[in-house]
């Protein structure tokens, strides 16, 4: 059980989870732009662009952010 907890705490993989109009982004590098219909951020050498409607920031931590809103497009750009 302790091993599972340590693995969870030490997990550095990027994750993007979208469910029920909630977008949970874990282990991002840097937030670039935050608008009500557009969010962009860096993950290592990639840029993630999220377009949507009524995108509202619900939680902001050093390595995680939670958005609420309808996603209309998601784009990954090599930078």
Label each region the model flagged:
Residues 2-79:
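N-terminal intrinsically disordered, cationic/polar leader segments
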């Amino acid at each position: 059980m302790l091993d599972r907890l340590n693995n969870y705490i030490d997990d550095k993989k990027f994750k993007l989870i979208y469910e029920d109009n909630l977008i949970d982004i874990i282990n991002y590098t840097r937030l670039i732009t935050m608008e009500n219909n557009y969010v962009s951020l860096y993950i290592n050498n990639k840029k993630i662009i999220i377009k949507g409607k009524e995108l509202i920031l619900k939680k902001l931590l050093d390595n995680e952010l939670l958005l609420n809103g309808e996603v209309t497009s998601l784009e990954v750009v090599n930078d």
